[in-house]
Amino acid sequence: LICYNDHGYTGKTTETCENGETTCYEKSR
């Protein structure tokens, strides 16, 4: 997953997103 927060991309790719990272997208590639 690619983690995003209210400000945009967090720069992290993890299996789970932390609290406050409200939107997660599956990696497209």
Swiss-Prot record:
Any one Gene Ontology molecular-function term assigned to this protein's record: ion channel regulator activity
Keyword Disulfide bond: yes
Entry GO CC: extracellular region
Tissue: Expressed by the venom gland.
Coiled-coil regions listed: none
InterPro entries: Snake_toxin-like_sf (IPR045860)
Disulfide linkage: C3-C24
Organism domain of life: Eukaryota
Compartments (UniProt record): Secreted
Keywords for this protein: Acetylcholine receptor inhibiting toxin, Disulfide bond, Ion channel impairing toxin, Neurotoxin, Postsynaptic neurotoxin, Secreted, Toxin
Transmembrane region(s): none
Family (UniProt): Belongs to the three-finger toxin family. Short-chain subfamily. Type I alpha-neurotoxin sub-subfamily.
Function according to Swiss-Prot or TrEMBL: Binds to muscle nicotinic acetylcholine receptor (nAChR) and inhibit acetylcholine from binding to the receptor, thereby impairing neuromuscular transmission.
Protein name: Frontoxin VI
